[in-house]
């Protein structure tokens, strides 16, 4: 697999924000070498995701004005939200892996399937946010909920922009 696609997959892991998840890497090397390479990449992605998740939480903690009482109630809900977001993120990683594996041989049907499933993942993220608005609002004010989701969306937008800049365009396939 070329370096650009490998970098794409590692960056994709970053976009998923929290928790260790899996990743497969296509390789023409011997199976044992491919397995070792995949394990190393999986570990890199897991560490990167944990680091980004931690930094996101620090960013929110530094910018979201919470009283001690609010913080005690907010952070468990945030952790639950982040865990559900990471599960959706697993689907995003799977799509990026599939895209990387099909790069250079992708058919029209495969391209359409990938974009439809990618949009479905985006929709799931939006639905998760909608689901959590009233849950967060039970523990903090409406303004705080709105501010949290502004930061959450800004953080994700930055990652998405970086990721999009690294993903080769479908029509650019050899």
What are these regions (language model features)?
Residues 13-15, 116, 141, 146:
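Generic secretory/membrane-interface signal
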Residues 17, 82-85, 122, 156-159, ...:
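A short hydrophobic/aromatic micro-motif that marks alpha-helical segments and, especially, helix-coil
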Residues 1-50, 164-174:
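Classical N-terminal targeting signals for secretion and organelle import
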